[in-house]
Amino acid sequence: MVDQGFFTLKKEKKKNILIKLFYVKILGFCFCDSWSSSDMAHSLTSLAVFQSVIRKEMVRSLHVYESVEIEREFWFKSKSCYVEKKAKPLFRSEDFRRPEISEGSVFGTWRCIFVFRFNHSLPRFPTLLCLSRNPKLEDIPNLANELKFISELKPSKIYEEEQCSSSTEGYYNSDLPKPRKLVLKQDLNCLPDSETESEESVNEKTEHSEFENDKTEQSESDAKTEILKKKKRTPSRHVAELSLEELSKYFDLTIVEASRNLKVGLTVLKKKCREFGIPRWPHRKIKSLDCLIHDLQREAEKQQEKNEAAAMAVAKKQEKLETEKRNIVKRPFMEIGIETKKFRQENFKKRHRASRAKKNQESLVTSSST
């Protein structure tokens, strides 16, 4: 008797729900006083939300409760509360087909931004319809309660049927015998009768592959040791102890050669130069001064035989250049003087003229000999 009473109660509840849904269908927009939006959400089978392409603040929603379809329109005001408006049926017309609804699809001036179907994978909520990000949705409970109901659904409930179907398929497939893979044991390069020859060739191939693997392993180990050697950094104490006097010993060399002799990395040496206020390694300045001094020495030797006064003037120039070189070694941030730059340019022109004259003489000699 208890069971029968229980079933009769269930039937009565179902009848009440159907009656209320019938009233909802007739009224279209308004709900009965006894029927709350939260109760309605539990019977929701699908929901589609559309946004106007022309007016972004206008939003429409199509709610399907078992066999009843309700269409609503909302006004998403930016500066004030959201409002629900009376909606004329637009998506419930005979021309409109429900299966065609998908996220991103456009129907006239309305674009679909959200689609939910029961027993389907949960959709992604846009920021406009996300309750945590958009608290104004609470102003329109008819939409907010249903969005809350969808967000609270667990994926396990929705995927239950899909998982069952996949598991049953897997179970039935496991009973079936797996197809065997065909493997050719015969070497295609040899005749079918010559089994011994094919075995020998296989052995040779395996030995060759093992030898190659050993080679690759050795090369990899060598590369690792080289990397480890390169990665060894100079101790910080050695770098800190480097003074300007030590650096000045190698100013006549290039910066790369100097870093090798000092047993310091190139970047470390450059950093040290910046600390001492050296913007550029003074190798070129000192080299150019050395060349000029060497040229003046030659001139002085020549002038001593002809004219002593000219030789004395050359010697004075030489002394000036030597003092300038010493100053640059002491203070490498110094630039070469204007007079020395002019003298360097003149010296370069002299050399160039001499080399051209020499070439012309050689060409004349060759032409006369022919």
Curated annotation (Swiss-Prot):
It comes from the Eukaryota. The lineage of its organism: Eukaryota, Viridiplantae, Streptophyta, Embryophyta, Tracheophyta. Its main location: nucleus. Residues 349-358 have a biased composition (Basic residues). It comes from Arabidopsis thaliana. This is Protein RKD5. One of its GO terms (cellular component) is nucleus. InterPro entries: RKD-like, RWP-RK_dom. Residues 193-232, 347-370 are annotated as: Disordered.
